[in-house]
From Swiss-Prot:
<feature type="binding site">
    <location>
        <begin position="172"/>
        <end position="173"/>
    </location>
    <ligand>
        <name>dUMP</name>
    </ligand>
</feature>
<dbReference type="InterPro" id="IPR036926">
    <property type="entry name" value="Thymidate_synth/dCMP_Mease_sf"/>
</dbReference>
<keyword id="KW-0489">Methyltransferase</keyword>
<feature type="binding site" description="in other chain">
    <location>
        <begin position="255"/>
        <end position="257"/>
    </location>
    <ligand>
        <name>dUMP</name>
    </ligand>
</feature>
<feature type="binding site">
    <location>
        <position position="217"/>
    </location>
    <ligand>
        <name>(6R)-5,10-methylene-5,6,7,8-tetrahydrofolate</name>
    </ligand>
</feature>
<dbReference type="InterPro" id="IPR000398">
    <property type="entry name" value="Thymidylate_synthase"/>
</dbReference>
<keyword id="KW-0963">Cytoplasm</keyword>
<dbReference type="GO" id="GO:0004799">
    <property type="term" value="F:thymidylate synthase activity"/>
</dbReference>
<comment type="pathway">
    <text>Pyrimidine metabolism; dTTP biosynthesis.</text>
</comment>
<dbReference type="GO" id="GO:0006231">
    <property type="term" value="P:dTMP biosynthetic process"/>
</dbReference>
<dbReference type="InterPro" id="IPR045097">
    <property type="entry name" value="Thymidate_synth/dCMP_Mease"/>
</dbReference>
<keyword id="KW-0545">Nucleotide biosynthesis</keyword>
<comment type="similarity">
    <text>Belongs to the thymidylate synthase family. Bacterial-type ThyA subfamily.</text>
</comment>
<dbReference type="GO" id="GO:0005829">
    <property type="term" value="C:cytosol"/>
</dbReference>
<feature type="binding site" description="in other chain">
    <location>
        <position position="225"/>
    </location>
    <ligand>
        <name>dUMP</name>
    </ligand>
</feature>
<comment type="function">
    <text>Catalyzes the reductive methylation of 2'-deoxyuridine-5'-monophosphate (dUMP) to 2'-deoxythymidine-5'-monophosphate (dTMP) while utilizing 5,10-methylenetetrahydrofolate (mTHF) as the methyl donor and reductant in the reaction, yielding dihydrofolate (DHF) as a by-product. This enzymatic reaction provides an intracellular de novo source of dTMP, an essential precursor for DNA biosynthesis.</text>
</comment>
<dbReference type="InterPro" id="IPR020940">
    <property type="entry name" value="Thymidylate_synthase_AS"/>
</dbReference>
């Protein structure tokens, strides 16, 4: 994957040293972008062995709104262990609910975003509209001396995206995100990959994805997040009857940790192999074939439903994760 190596080289050439919360310096480059045509192959790094099953396990965990490192481990992904159980700041956080807990990270926000409305009791039309939209009253409170009602519902952002792709593909507001200011302090780690926008084209029957990442560890995180984003686009396309096409990947702070430099410099000496193809299991329903809309498969997929065909790679390389 030459685009990945070009990004690494750009950071080495143009990045500036910065200190950060982990205590390991980074070479950082503000504003970076990658773009892939998924009809030409899957964006898997080939200059080292990609931890494909781990990345897919994490994605499946997100789809299931997982908040436990133990549940991620059961899906074949161990990358959350340190953040859950070894980060001193998180261990002292009053919102941590015990060993392996991560708080309402990523998928919890994707699938169960906590939405509240505080409405005047006298605003009967507003209250009725909220109730019709699935909110339920949880309390009556006084606000500025006037009676109000507090209403709540959990918003499944990702399901709403699928429903909109299915029902109104020309909509330009098909997106979800995980940056919930009200719960950031309750998370072991605030979201890095935080905004996903789907762009279906009903004429070509192709669907594209723009992903914005506020901060990306290019040595370890970028290969993971590219895998997850591209696999998610394939899955959404399968469930809605669209072919995955353009995957655009935007990074706010693209950085390389100082102790990752040997690994990345070794990769720069290696020639990338051709891109593999992602294969989805036949058990995942294909809307283009069946004509049956089955969005419940968002949480029913298993890591084994995703495989890479024709994946060639160089020898594995490792580096420590900064926590």
């Amino acid at each position: 994957m030459k685009q990945y190596l070009d990004l690494v080289q750009s950071i080495l050439d143009q990045g500036a040293w910065q200190e950060n919360r982990t205590g390991v310096r980074t070479l950082s480059l503000p504003g970076a972008a990658l773009r892939f045509d998924l009809q030409q192959g899957f964006p898997a790094v080939t200059t080292k062995k990609l931890a494909f099953k781990s990345a897919i396990g994490e994605m499946v965990g997100f789809l299931r709104a997982t908040r436990s490192a133990a549940q991620f481990r059961a899906l074949g992904c161990k990358v959350w262990d340190q953040n859950a159980n070894e980060n001193e700041q998180w261990l002292a956080n009053p919102y941590r609910e015990g060993p392996d807990d991560l708080g309402p990270v990523y998928g919890v926000q994707w699938r169960h975003w906590p939405a509240y409305k505080l409405l005047p009791r006298s605003a009967g039309g507003q209250v009725a509209d909220a109730l019709a939209r699935g909110y339920r009253q949880v309390a009556e409170v006084a606000e500025n001396g006037a009676p109000h009602v507090l209403l709540y519902k959990a918003v499944d952002q990702l399901r709403q995206c699928l429903d909109t792709i299915h029902q109104s593909p020309g909509d330009r507001r098909i997106l979800f995100h995980g940056w919930n200011w009200a719960q950031i302090e309750e998370m072991a780690l605030p979201p890095c990959h935080l905004l996903y926008q789907f762009l279906p084209n009903a004429g070509t029957r192709e669907i594209s994805l723009c992903l914005y990442i506020r901060s990306n560890d290019v040595g370890l995180g970028t290969p993971f997040n590219l895998t997850e984003g591209a696999a998610l686009l394939h899955l959404v396309g399968r469930l809605t009857g669209y072919k995955p096409r353009w995957f655009s990947y935007f990074i706010g702070d693209a950085h390389v940790y100082e102790n990752h430099l040997p690994m990345l410099r070794e990769q720069l000496t290696r020639e990338p192999y051709p891109a593999p193809q992602l294969v989805l299991s036949d058990r995942i329903p294909d809307f283009a074939v069946t004509g049956k809309y089955e969005p419940q498969w968002l949480e029913q997929v298993e890591p084994g439903d995703f495989t890479l065909s024709g994946y060639q790679h160089h020898a594995p390389l490792t580096a420590p994760m900064a926590v």
